[in-house]
From Swiss-Prot:
Primary location recorded for the protein, binned into one broad class: mitochondrion
Transmembrane portions of the chain: none
GO annotation, biological process: mitochondrial translation
Subcellular locations according to the entry: Mitochondrion
Species for this entry: Drosophila melanogaster
Cytoplasm in keyword set: no
UniProt-listed Gene3D superfamilies: 4.10.410.60
Alphabetic keyword roster: Mitochondrion, Ribonucleoprotein, Ribosomal protein, Transit peptide
PANTHER family: 39S RIBOSOMAL PROTEIN L35, MITOCHONDRIAL, LARGE RIBOSOMAL SUBUNIT PROTEIN BL35M
Family: Belongs to the bacterial ribosomal protein bL35 family.
InterPro entries: Ribosomal_bL35-like, Ribosomal_bL35_sf, Ribosomal_bL35m
Protein name: Large ribosomal subunit protein bL35m
GO molecular function, one term: structural constituent of ribosome
Amino acid sequence: MLRTFVTSALRSVCRQSPAASSLVPLVQRTQRATLMTLSRPCLLPTPSLASPAHHQLLQLPGVLAATGTPSNTRNVTKFSLVKGKRKTVKAVLKRFKRLDWGAWIRTHSGRQKKLFKKSAALRRRLKQHVFTNATQSWLLDKMVTSYWRRPKHFINDPYKPYHSRNEYYATQSKTFKV
């Protein structure tokens, strides 16, 4: 709710500010509404926008990065411009698979490159999948919406044996006596 309020407030302030009119098409083109990009030009007090030096500084985002303030890196969490809700990063769905118990698996990088140079043991290991660690799983869960975090049951799923985790007591599948 706070995110929706902030984005709507930023949108209304940006509509009123004449200096921020050149920034709005940039945000709409990239479809990223990060708070860092929108808050700098729009939330400055209006008297400071009167000087031409500030107006020129606001139009050049590269100047802000050169002055020592942190530049906008690729923020993996994206937000919609209309409601401010999180969006799913499509590269996560393409490269990773989420298991029902919360872990993410992926294939080895470079598993199909220059196989003639690699030993037979390495080629065998490259065919196997790798689990992500807890930090990576937490980040990947943030990058997808709740729809993709829910368990999905597909017909003839090759990952079906890996969706249940039976080595711990808390996650063992329970058998019922009839």
